[in-house]
């Protein structure tokens, strides 16, 4: 893994916060998606990678996020499979880890609506970027 992961700043919106005064748990997956949507075109230099579909999502919550927190999501790839890309995340609130997460994206052919192999070029770019 790189010394410093790719990070994305997240703006916590007023409507993200529930009656308990913290970001609703369902919004964390939206924050993860926002990080992926910035990471994939940046690293792979194509928006075609955004056609992948979510196959697995796991989130462990460490502390609440409030409207006052400065939030960022750190994202990195831990594995590139035949047709999958496994991501790890840290959701950070004012410098503290608020949640950790993992997703698995399946590279998807939008015409056939079937999984397809990770292109060699993507694999090479991810491995070079992440130091895998």
Where in the sequence are the language-model features?
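Hot-dog-fold acyl-thioester-processing enzymes
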Residues: 2-56, 110-132
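HotDog/MaoC-like acyl-thioester-processing domains
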Residues: 3, 61, 66-67, 78-132
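Hydrophobic residues positioned within well-ordered beta-strands of beta-sheet architectures
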Residues: 6-10, 55-57, 73, 87, ...
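Acidic side chains
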Residues: 16-18, 60, 69
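ABC ATPase A-loop
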Residues: 52, 66, 70
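OB-fold and OB-like beta-barrel modules that bind single-stranded nucleic acids
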Residues: 71-77
């Amino acid at each position: 893994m790189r010394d410093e992961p790719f990070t994305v700043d997240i703006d916590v919106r007023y409507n993200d916060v529930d009656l308990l005064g913290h970001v609703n748990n369902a919004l964390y997956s939206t924050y993860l998606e926002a990080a992926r949507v910035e990471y994939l075109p940046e690293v792979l230099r194509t928006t075609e990678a955004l056609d992948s579909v979510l196959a697995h999502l796991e989130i462990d919550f460490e502390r609440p996020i409030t409207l006052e927190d400065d939030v960022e999501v750190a994202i990195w790839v831990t594995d590139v499979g035949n047709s999958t890309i496994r991501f790890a995340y840290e959701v950070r609130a004012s410098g503290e880890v608020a949640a950790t997460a993992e997703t698995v994206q399946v590279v998807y052919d939008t015409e056939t609506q079937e999984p397809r192999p990770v292109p060699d070029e993507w694999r090479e770019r991810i491995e070079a970027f992440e130091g895998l």
